[in-house]
Amino acid sequence: MAGHTVMAVVRDPVKRLLSCYSNRVMHHQELSEQKAGAALQAADLPCDPDLSTFVERLPEYCAAVESIWHHAMPMVEYLGRDPQFYTHLYPIEATATLQAEVERQTGIAAKLKRLQTKGPKIDPGTLSAQEVALLKDFYAEDYTLYGAYC
């Protein structure tokens, strides 16, 4: 990719997971009996889990329901394991900077939108120390490779 600009947006994995729970589980009800009951029953997982249950059994929910995996998978699964591949890595809070860089490089007005914003905002402080530890373990490679950019 020499000579090319390669950009990505990164987000703190715990905050990203909380957003996934808020939007996909609470708002879209993707772990409801109606939408995922059969898959969850087959995996012996409860429908409509509370946050603690979701965190404690995250790998199982990811394996049982594709849309949860899609939104909760570690960043290394789609960004790869070499941050040096990217010429620019932007934390999600810096999308305005990314937008300005895209406009600068292309000469075209760029509009970056956040599309999945529904659901309550969940403060990371609501997680117990044990839940944070579980998530840090699940996302360990993300923190190792991309944590400095979040």
Language-model-detected regions and their locations in the chain:
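Charged phosphate-binding loop/patch that engages nucleotide di/tri-phosphates or the phosphate backbone
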Residues: A110-C150
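PAPS-dependent sulfotransferase catalytic domain
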Residues: M1-V10, K15-K118, I122
